[in-house]
């Protein structure tokens, strides 16, 4: 079994069900605000803030939703800036998927119990820390917008610059 539970003093005990966290988080924040703030913190490289908001997400049972968003974030924002990260995420993704498959989907507390899984916590915090520290490049930010006139032969000729230097 993939559930490695932690010391009882670090365990989150709460009687609320997963349905209680559809729109608001464990502490009563709006779900969309928490998730957007988490990714803004990652964008700005604020590790402590990102870890705080990640904790809020994990306590609220958003474990697998956040995991998918972190993978997409890596593909869209970091990708070639940290080429070793994709292999690291692949290995961690296998562990996360095995844990997800081991959860009884009919159990009312199954997904919420992931917040008390030591492996899941460690994987998430290490990935978020790495994402915070990685260089980021937004897709398409650095590329100029092209117009139809940019493809006219005359405009192309004007842009060619060739200096002839004879040795």
What are the residue ranges of the model-derived segments?
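Amphipathic alpha-helical repeat scaffolds
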Residues: 35-40, 55
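Compositionally biased low-complexity segments enriched in polar/charged residues
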Residues: 1-4
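C-terminal alpha-helical interaction modules of replication/initiation AAA+ assemblies
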Residues: 11-23, 27, 32, 49-167
